[in-house]
Amino acid sequence: ELANEEQKNDWLPKLISGDCQLTFAYAEEQSRFDLEDVLTRAKPDEKGGFIIDGAKSMVLHAASADAMIVSCRTSGGQYEKKGISLLLVPKDLEGINIDSFETVDGQRAAEVRFESVRVEGNALLGREGDAFSTIERAQQSGILALCAEATGIMECLYKDTASYTQDREQFDRPMSEFQVIQHRLVDMFMEYEQCKSMLLR
């Protein structure tokens, strides 16, 4: 949405083909996911680029990504919505330190530190200092996608469980014929339908 034609031509074909992966680095240790609470700074340099200093928390799949879209403060104070910019930062630049770890759901995330990391001026996505509304929309879309994924997983688990109870026998009868099992399956089905209803609304 913010990329110019040059950035789209450089990155979109590689992203579509799967040859390149991006991740979004926006959360910080002190922010507790308040999107406007940004301490990571990007200062313009004399050559038209930016020098990035700061840290990002819980960056999903940072270690396996080729580049990061990083929210940085280019002006204003810590809690101001105005003054936040997005920079497209290749992962292999000097000064980037990635501390990767496994999350509770088996994914990978990382703490990422930027120490005087220099990017060119064309790393800026959109207008300088005007990225907050885009970050907000991206987060909302991401949350919706995760909810859809979780609802789909619930559907698979419910159907697999129902199928298993029909195949598995106990006391010479399928488990699905036992009332206590039927009650549990109904509970699973109702919880799945409630989640699907919330998602579609």
Task: List PLM regions with ranges.
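Short Gly/Pro-enriched turn/cap motifs at secondary-structure boundaries
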Residues: 30-33, 58-61, 77-78, 101-109
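A generic, well-ordered mixed alpha/beta core segment in the N-terminal half of proteins
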Residues: 3-16
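Glycine-rich beta->alpha junctions and the first turn(s) of the following alpha-helix
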Residues: 96-194
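A short, Trp-centered hydrophobic/proline-enriched beta-strand micro-motif
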Residues: 18-26
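Residue-level signal for inorganic ion chemistry
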Residues: 4, 54, 87, 114, ...
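N-terminal glycine-rich flavin-associated loop
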Residues: 1-6, 32, 46
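A short core secondary-structure module
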Residues: 49, 53-97
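A structural signal for short hydrophobic beta-strand segments in well-ordered beta-sheet cores
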Residues: 40-43
